[in-house]
């Protein structure tokens, strides 16, 4: 062991010293990969062309300044100030990059032609002509557009597609593109929804800073991005400030600031110096008494400063959540309007806070770091006046000079000596023959003035020192005389002038016998200078507040009068003030009118003018209105102020009793359903009905129809089960069950027992509904023949609810009551249940909840103190309340999770409870009511509850801070939390569902899944047994519950609509925990992206709960050419290593798999398999020894496996994968009616109108001869030997496996043992009978298909596919949809068979043969003679059936036709379980995921792409047509196959690959092919080098043989 450890240490040392070549190679490869990845990332940046001629240094400078762009320097245009002109385009693109693409944008002083070229039709340019230069510039912009159009016309080309919208807008409405008004005066308004933005490129100088905020607010600008030139030297008392990087200069003269380019003769730009300083120094710009625009610097690049102005609502100050209209103190807001002015004054005085931070100043003014401002003095010989200026000098330089010259003797302290020293330390010196550059770079032009300043400061400092020293001595003369004597000795003849200047300048003050010397400041910091400038330019005037106070007094008097109203705290003060100002009416007059209206003293027909109230007011009067007036006894002490508030003809009671009067005298019981004919229950149509009455009544009618549709679908399916069941099968346990009353046994045994009702078949064949009673697991039956039950009939809840609602109708109409309904819309964990328990009075109120568990939880929490308050009478489930009404009225009704209910159900609950007030608690962003009856119409406007009032709760008591941050993107208003946990969300992407095991992969806390299939699989793996919470639930099942720790698991690799960032299921899953949340997923999905985003948010942001997201959009450029595919021969180059590199890049790690002995390991190790009911002959478990087949060894490494041998374990694993554990996602579905509807849609969508009618008999002599011509003699011989006495067993199938495993193009082969594909097939006799039949039916179907629009990929060549897609118009905006379905064959159930049979019926399938075929595909038995396995399957698609391929194709086409408007589809193709659709861009589509789940039982994934992928081929559509490329990755994977037996076999393999990949010989569209591959494989790189290598090896027979090593055992 010691020797082994020493060897390991030596190898590590060798690797560190570079002597290990293997490690060095790996390091070099890592560097190469990083470089390639970085270059690829850089190539994806937006491209900008820089045509101006600039120097190499300027090129480097521009490239470093704008790393966001891919800049191409052409150097083809000579121009004045080339650098600044070229940078202007970069600056504009940088500003526009900050704005979400398509958002309304105002370009202040912009160049409209630049936006036209980019196709930005959403930008409006304000281009005022403030001087002559502006007029000339605008004319030049128009000329450039004309030149561009002329160049296109000369080359006979049209405008690119992305520019057409902008140019059309300029042609039709040029004022919408640009105007000649100032931004402050611009009258243009886009009138479109969404946020508004603005940009200002070197243009905000000309807008007064005091008007800037108001101008932005007038346009409702959300954020304004601006760029302007500035120099730190402008802060000094200097006249010029150069901008060397762009060759420009600022010149200051008083308040006039000029800007001009050096070496250029043109007009100067002139601005106000004070205005520019305000933009630099102010931190916010007031826009109104509420809104301000806060300025933030973004960056400085090449003498250009970038900043943004963000609109800020000051009402958010010191408040976490902004609320309106619910605070009673708002009545006094009008009195305090004067405080708004004081607040504005206070905010203005605090604007300089950023400049008190020295670090902040140095950051935004990088050139002032370690600099000081030194005064300079310049005198005039002629006038005798002196002028003062300032300069910025290095602080170290100043102190070096001052410290040195203070050491001079008095005689040596002269101006010449000081100047000599300053010049010496500034200039270059030679040391030992080497020139050394000075440490300080001070301008030589100011050295003389600086020397004079230094001399003067030193003289005054020495005089001050002498005075201090002589204070300790006694002198005969005064201090003043001593001081002047000292100065006179120092300056000599200049003494009179110096004395006068020192006194007048304030440096020396003389008062009687006292002397005060003030030494000048050696310097001031730029921060102090900046504050001084700001104070000098921002003087505030006193405000006249007499008028606001007078106006506030009027509003106060009016609001005092309104305060007598009930619930006056909900009065909207803002709307009241707007009404008074718009109508110019005195507030007290309006108040005197509002009070009688709100007290209902004017007998108006409604209280509030809502659409619902108007509908009630305009609806017909009740028929019994006269009778109600007769029954009514009026009195002055009546509790109700007006007649209209009475709900019925009975006077209300003053207390809450136990009686309630129903409108209908006859209450129908559920028992009336017993022995009722099924025809009276089944709905004839599910089409949309037209409802009448107010919206609430329409919702209630729709809910009753929903219950009827649910019962109808269940009854219809039970009738179908009775019709389909013939023989007995007591062993299987399915969803449905059929009991034979005569025989007293189950023909079809159900999983569950004790169903509440079912459908019975009488002796005369009539079918009726029966209510069941049970004894010893068997139903107690009458004089019936058979009884059918299903999993949809365990209880009669829908029946009970429907009968209760029918009993409460008045003249066939629901009785509508109008209590106050309040929606409490709260975020997860806001304490909705807690609020209910704290508010409810259990003696007179009622609580209703959707489920039993929630009901138990509320009762438990209410009674936890020991005092029993909550019972089964005042806390009930919704179903219990509707099924068992009790004669009692309630004061308040509380509905928990009310938004999960049908809105009509909520209205019924409110009406039947006779409550005075209803509180509906829910969350509008969580899972809503789900319509589980396929094809039942539930209109969108029915989904909104009619409310009297809405309250919001935005404080979560449950969720941690990171989850609260996520919720802020979902809810209006700010969401807060009280949880101390900051970070709780974590995620882990596992390599496959095979890693989940309770021992090796324990899950913490509550285990949750998104789908029922994942839930079932985790149960089978044993997680429910070890979980601390016991049961595993789906997200939908645990909405409203709370847990400390949560583990969410996703085992389904296919994309799910449930898991998207906008899905309510994701929100529910993320908000169930209080401490920790961990997400385990087998794929990268949006929830993993949410975790990734949350992990990047800083703790500071989490405290603010703010979401900031941007939208990036890439401009697409189309072409205008049409014609045939351009052909460019592909070069035959490259090596096998190129294909290997490409394969490893797209599927990293697959080539390193050692799977040669996986099958052996599988047979030797202990395996746990989830097997359904089957019979296994274990004598087959030991395979017969056989001689091992030798195969060629590929030189190319892939994840391909060798062929496997059939055996018990191998075949069983394949059967489990392909046939067992089928999904069960279907909702309530009326199979026969829905199948008929789907087939009608299929016929309307795909069949040509002229061929849509009339059935053609397929079994004709012509059809038989066509079939015979294509058959082998052996097949005909089988028919000749068949006796035709009886048909073979049509429901018996044989089972076998394919020896070669299917290669997967993902990473799953690294973690999973791939199951083999199975073949389930009939006997040859059955195929000989039904083969020609369905072949003829298929031919007739394909002849009727509209082949110009739809492609059914049967008997088609790759060239025909290419021809089908060649007429796609690339100029039409469109997108590609791909619906891919996992577990496609075994997901097909009874509904799919019904759809397929109806299609064959329309084509003329014989009735007897159809019935035989049905029975052969209902309940079937599988026998695998090789492995000794026998099992039973219900429905499912059989892989070796005569209808497998065409049946799968028809089903996928029917599925899409039932969900997508096929008349809007441009092109569509179907093949087996693959499909592709080309649809117009922006087409509104339904929820395809929900439809595929509930109706079709499919686990579907919907892809939206630019390029199509169909049957292993990429469809590249371009401006000349389309070309179809075989998937290169699949092709390379096949080159690593391990099943080649001989050279002849190898040559056949090469020829087959050449046939499918012939299009790769054309390399003209390899660029688009790379883009298409990148959509599928995120790690893809440009693979043109690999494609060339493929062509090279496939085209050469001898070269292709080098890809495989036949070894010594291979025989030709």
UniProtKB/Swiss-Prot annotation:
Which intervals hold domain (+)RNA virus helicase ATP-binding? Answer: 794-953
What segment(s) does the record annotate as region Methyltransferase?
A: 50-452
Pfam families per UniProt: RdRP_2, ToMV_Hel_N, Viral_helicase1, Vmethyltransf
Q: InterPro entries, per this entry?
A: (+)RNA_virus_helicase_core_dom (IPR027351), Alphavirus-like_MT_dom (IPR002588), DNA/RNA_pol_sf (IPR043502), P-loop_NTPase (IPR027417), RNA-dep_RNA_pol_alsuvir (IPR001788), RNA-dir_pol_PSvirus (IPR007094), ToMV_Hel_N (IPR049329), Virgaviridae_RdRp (IPR047310)
Query: Domain (+)RNA virus helicase C-terminal: where?
Result: 954-1112
| Alphabetized SUPFAM superfamilies for the sequence | DNA/RNA polymerases (SSF56672), P-loop containing nucleoside triphosphate hydrolases (SSF52540)
Reaction(s) this enzyme catalyzes, per UniProt: RNA(n) + a ribonucleoside 5'-triphosphate = RNA(n+1) + diphosphate; ATP + H2O = ADP + phosphate + H(+)
**GO biological process terms, semicolon-separated:** DNA-templated transcription; mRNA modification; RNA processing; symbiont-mediated suppression of host innate immune response; viral RNA genome replication
Cysteine-cysteine disulfides: none
MF terms per GO, please? Answer: ATP binding; ATP hydrolysis activity; mRNA methyltransferase activity; RNA binding; RNA helicase activity; RNA-directed RNA polymerase activity
Q: Where does the record place the RdRp catalytic domain?
A: 1374-1487
Q: Which family does it belong to?
A: Belongs to the ssRNA positive-strand viruses RNA-directed RNA polymerase family.
Quaternary data: Heterodimer of a large and a small subunit.
Q: What else is known?
A: This protein is translated as a fusion protein by episodic readthrough of a termination codon. When readthrough of the terminator codon TGA occurs between the codons for Leu-1112 and Gln-1114, this results in the addition of the RdRp region to the replicase.
Protein name listed in UniProt: Replicase large subunit
Query: Which organism is this protein's natural source?
Result: Odontoglossum ringspot virus (isolate Singapore 1) (ORSV)
